[in-house]
């Protein structure tokens, strides 16, 4: 079973990498970009028997390792 985890900084958390990207885009004359938020995408392939078991397992991975839940939110998508 394949899954994708999308990890983004929570609203209100400063995103210096996103701001650096925005400034670089502006310097390249992409002046219509109002803001940029950078995140992470992690693709996983699991040996789970059910979608529910896969989601439970991935949630545990996110809580323990993949995401810093103090400042990041994550979204799980089964592919």
Language model: regions and residue ranges:
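Short beta-strand-to-loop capping motifs
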Residues: 7-9, 43-49
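Long, contiguous binding/interaction regions
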Residues: 2-4, 8-39, 54-55, 59-79
């Amino acid at each position: 079973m394949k899954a994708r985890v999308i990890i983004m900084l929570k609203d209100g958390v400063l995103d210096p990498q996103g701001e650096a990207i925005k400034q670089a885009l502006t310097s390249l004359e992409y002046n219509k970009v109002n803001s940029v938020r950078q995140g992470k995408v992690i693709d996983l392939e699991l040996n789970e028997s059910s979608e529910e078991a896969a989601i439970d397992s991935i949630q545990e991975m996110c809580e323990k390792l993949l995401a810093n839940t103090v400042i990041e939110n994550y979204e799980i998508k089964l592919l």
